[in-house]
Amino acid sequence: MKPLLSLDRVSVSRDGRNVLDKLSLSLAAGERLALIGDNGVGKTTLLRTIVGLEPASGEITAFGINCRNESDFRKIRAKAAYLFQNPDDQLFCPTVIDDVAFGPLNLGLSRQEAMELSNGLLHDLGLGHLAGRITHHLSGGEKRLVSLAAVLAMQPQVLLLDEPTNALDEKHLERMLAILSAQKIAMIIVSHDWEILERLTDRAVVLRNGKLLPAMLHRHSQWSEQVHLHYVEAEGSAL
């Protein structure tokens, strides 16, 4: 079966250095991939590159489309939803329901269809009480959950999540984890919280010096409950 997403020898240069250096990656349907790395190593750049928000060399193929121009990437962004690290970068409409309905409207649904879908989704996610709220009056945790609802409203095949649980209190963290755990779609999740990645993902890679290294998140419960990282041998050149 062909992967949903495939990057082949993709490079992104910035200030004279390769942030991504002939990097290859594939993501299968339903697969949940943890993307790990130090601050500033290029994890966000990689997510942005997948949806065409960074100029890159190499080959990016997604959903059967060999992406060569902005027209191709617009089709990709309808199926690969990117959750920004800062929810204020994602939410710009007056009310929550308007923010959630924005994506479906942009995909061609009528206003009635978009509102019905968005209200139903908010209800299903346990966020129905927020529908009429003014977005900029929400707490940080509420904004993060609403931004997730906004990308899910586009009914994507892949979620690209940039630090989705960062700075959430316990209540909003558990709500976020419950929502993500219930999704039956592929994901790439960037996070510094290995405990959360171990709960949500089934494969891990580490971005270092522009390359991806295969890894495994693991815990030895008989010695320690703390999750730690093992590097593993790759079975071929593509991850």
UniProtKB/Swiss-Prot annotation:
Gene3D superfamilies for this protein: P-loop containing nucleotide triphosphate hydrolases
EC number: 7.-.-.-
UniProt feature coiled coil, ranges: none
Record keywords: ATP-binding, Cell inner membrane, Cell membrane, Membrane, Nucleotide-binding, Translocase, Transport
Residues reported to bind ATP: G37, D38, N39, G40, V41, G42, K43, T44
GO molecular function: ATP binding; ATP hydrolysis activity; ATPase-coupled transmembrane transporter activity
Stretches assigned to the ABC transporter domain: 5-234
SUPFAM superfamilies: P-loop containing nucleoside triphosphate hydrolases (SSF52540)
Ribosomal protein listed as a keyword: no
Recorded topology in the membrane: Peripheral membrane protein
UniProt keyword Nucleotide-binding present: yes
GO cellular component, as recorded: ATP-binding cassette (ABC) transporter complex
Pfam families per record: ABC_tran
Localization, UniProt: Cell inner membrane
Assigned protein family: Belongs to the ABC transporter superfamily.
PANTHER family: ENERGY-COUPLING FACTOR TRANSPORTER ATP-BINDING PROTEIN ECFA1 (PTHR43553:SF24), HEAVY METAL TRANSPORTER (PTHR43553)
Protein name in UniProt: Putative ABC transporter ATP-binding protein BR1368/BS1330_I1363
Species this protein is from: Brucella suis biovar 1 (strain 1330)
